[in-house]
Design a protein with these regions (language model features):
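An alpha-helical appendage that flanks or caps ligand/catalytic pockets
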Residues: 1-85
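Flexible loop residues that form catalytic
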Residues: 93
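C-terminal helical cap(s) of enzyme catalytic domains, especially alpha/beta-barrels
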Residues: 97-118
Length: 118
């Protein structure tokens, strides 16, 4: 099983824009407690505890899938192909999001992303 945050919008730019603040708040809160210890540094080695990653770093490390339904589906498909993924838990709610946004993200994932994954 894998847990990954998602932000699905009609365009990559809009998804990035709507994910940034919530992502940054999430990591300001949890980064100091070592939650980022799974991130890899530029040297290919795990980073030390306390990293507060940028949205770009999280996207590069694929801890959050951001983009259009097609782009998010490509990220899920990559995990499935690389890891033989059978179960995926999505984290559809970023700090500051209203409840309705989480519901929207779950609905979009099921109706727009899942059908694109083989």
């Amino acid at each position: 099983m894998l847990v990954v945050a998602v932000r699905i919008e009609d365009t990559y730019e809009k998804a990035r824009e709507t994910a940034k603040n919530g992502h940054d708040e999430f990591w300001k809160f949890l980064g100091p407690y070592g939650w980022s210890r799974g991130y890899m540094g530029d040297d290919g080695k795990p980073v030390g505890p306390g990293l507060i990653p940028t949205l770009e770093q999280s996207m590069e490390q694929r801890t959050i899938l951001v983009g259009s339904p097609e782009e998010v589906a490509a990220g899920v498909q990559a995990y499935q192909d690389e890891l033989g993924l059978e179960y995926l838990t999505i984290y559809p709610h970023l700090p500051g999001d209203p409840y309705a946004k989480a519901v929207e993200q779950m609905e979009r994932f099921m109706t727009e992303v899942v059908p694109l994954v083989s």
